[in-house]
A protein has these predicted regions:
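Cleavable N-terminal signal peptides
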Residues: 2-3, 13
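Rhodanese-like catalytic fold shared by cysteine-dependent sulfurtransferases
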Residues: 14-43, 73-77, 81-83, 88-178
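A short, well-structured juxtamembrane/interface segment
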Residues: 41-55
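Short Gly/charged-rich anion-binding patches and loops
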Residues: 51, 67, 131
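Short, solvent-exposed loop/turn elements at domain surfaces
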Residues: 54, 71-74
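Short coil/turn segments at beta-strand junctions that form active-site/ligand-binding loops
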Residues: 59-64, 100-103
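Short hydrophobic beta-strand that contains or immediately precedes a catalytic carboxylate
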Residues: 62-67, 80-83
Length: 178
């Protein structure tokens, strides 16, 4: 029986070793291990809208939005910091969140209804919250909490802003007609 089990798992182990050997900078088995560990940790870190608001007001808390800069500029939770998911790396995290113990609140497209342009829905299994949580966990950030519910943006208690609201419009050039 043991011999059969070893024969069945040998090709899988060999395929994983070959994948890492082809490109040691890409480690799917390692990612899956971290994702499973992060999933267990995440279970107790999903917040209601009220909890998210309360925690966001406490000193030293950062709200992180990992959507693209374009979508962030269209609309985001007031006071959020933008670090687009593709840019999450050692150096960008050191700049944005230098202290790994900083309480970090995250949210994504799939948390909001009623604003499809700035918050386009993704497949539930491809939710940006999941990817962001796993990435932060993988980089050693453990004080991360996630907005849990699907919130109607028109009924939300959260404060939102856009880049145009956050910054004054530049003065218009004056036209002189002679």
């Amino acid at each position: 029986m043991l011999a059969v089990a070893l024969l069945c798992t040998a090709p899988l182990a060999s395929a994983q070793q070959n994948a890492v050997a082809l490109n040691p900078a890409i480690d799917m088995p390692g990612y899956l291990r971290v994702a499973a560990e992060a999933a267990k940790y995440r279970e107790t870190r999903r917040l209601s809208e009220d909890e998210f608001i309360r925690m966001s007001r406490e000193p030293g808390t950062v709200i992180l939005d990992a959507r693209s800069r374009e979508k962030f500029d269209e609309l985001h939770i007031k006071g959020a910091l933008n670090l687009s998911f593709p840019d999450i790396a050692v150096d960008s995290l050191k700049n944005a969140l230098p202290d790994k113990s900083t309480r970090t609140l995250i949210y994504c497209n799939n948390n909001f209804l009623g604003a499809e342009k700035p918050f386009p829905s993704k497949m539930a299994s491809a939710s940006l919250n999941i990817s962001t949580y796993i990435a932060l966990y993988n980089y050693g950030y453990r004080n991360v909490y996630e907005l849990g519910p699907l919130v109607d943006i028109k009924a939300s208690k959260l404060d939102f802003e856009s880049a145009t609201e956050a910054k004054p419009n530049p003065p218009r050039p004056q036209l002189f007609l002679f």
